[in-house]
């Protein structure tokens, strides 16, 4: 089974939890993304990995049209259900994968991808497609969890993420984002970076992590080297928590970012 099929199956199963999760529906980064976009009423927008539609809906009041795409039928069903509650008339959802977007070259003023890229088995193929569908003066805004540059910490974080969620591939480091963006002809600007608080019980329940895997995760966290525990700001009481890293990034075609 390839990465896309693993991701599709995982989110078909867990989609309702993502529809209501405060991290995705009410995260401060959602407002940061909208503000960074400076949207215009005539814009065409594409939301890649739209999930339950939170980013799609946040942008819709400010632009002409937003299309949300996702590979999970379960997620798209949640998005359509959420759309019916909002009465928006400029939003569409359809099935698509990030590496084969069914749209014309240079069609969109803005492409977004929020908390989805860590499910991609490689950044470059998806970024190449995003670049292809962007207008020459368009922009790409991404929000995602990121790995620190420290290899030990990065591997530990991704180990626990993969144990909790089989569809998790890798929390890409900023250096990897920069390299992949440059390889497809865009430049990257880091707009915001912050610590993302994680409540362990919510984290595992949202993905319906098996009891066996939950026990393994607890053991990994409890027996992690002290330096890792401190870096992740781990707590055990009154509830188990830790902190990841997240970033808001802007990519623009090199021709658009170059001085005249």
Protein language model features and the residues they cover:
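Conserved class I S-adenosyl-L-methionine
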Residues: 1-43, 54-58, 75-78, 141-163, 202-204
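Class I SAM-dependent methyltransferase SAM/SAH-binding core
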Residues: 46, 52-100
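Conserved Class I S-adenosyl-L-methionine
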Residues: 52, 189-260
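A short acidic, Gly/Pro-enriched loop at the edge of an enzyme's catalytic core
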Residues: 99-110
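A short SAM/SAH-binding and catalytic strip from SAM-dependent methyltransferases
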Residues: 109-122
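A short glycine-rich, Lys/Arg-flanked "PGG" loop and its adjoining helix->strand segment in the class I
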Residues: 124-136
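Short alpha-helix
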Residues: 170-184
């Amino acid at each position: 089974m390839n990465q896309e099929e693993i991701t599709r199956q995982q989110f078909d199963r867990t989609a309702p939890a993502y529809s209501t999760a405060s991290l995705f529906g009410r995260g401060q980064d959602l407002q940061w993304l909208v503000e960074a976009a400076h949207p215009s009423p005539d814009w065409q927008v594409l939301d890649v990995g739209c999930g339950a539609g939170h980013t799609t809906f946040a942008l819709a009041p400010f632009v002409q049209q937003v299309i949300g795409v996702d590979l999970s039928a379960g997620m798209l069903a949640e998005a359509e259900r959420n759309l019916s509650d909002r009465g928006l008339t400029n939003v569409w959802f359809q099935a698509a994968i990030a590496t084969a977007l069914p749209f014309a070259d240079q069609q969109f003023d803005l492409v977004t991808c929020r908390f989805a890229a860590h499910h991609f088995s490689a950044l470059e193929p998806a970024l190449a497609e995003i670049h292809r569908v962007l207008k020459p003066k368009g922009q790409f805004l991404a929000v995602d969890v990121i790995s620190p540059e420290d290899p030990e910490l990065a591997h530990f974080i991704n180990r626990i993420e993969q144990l909790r969620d089989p569809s998790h591939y890798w929390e890409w480091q900023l250096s990897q984002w920069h390299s992949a963006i440059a390889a497809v002809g865009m430049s990257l600007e880091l707009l915001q970076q912050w610590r993302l608080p994680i409540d362990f019980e919510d984290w595992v329940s949202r993905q319906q992590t098996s009891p066996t895997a939950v026990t393994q995760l607890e053991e990994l966290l409890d027996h992690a080297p002290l330096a890792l525990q401190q870096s992740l700001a781990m707590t055990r009481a009154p509830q188990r928590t830790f902190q990841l890293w997240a970033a808001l990034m802007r990519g623009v075609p090199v021709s658009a970012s170059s001085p005249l």
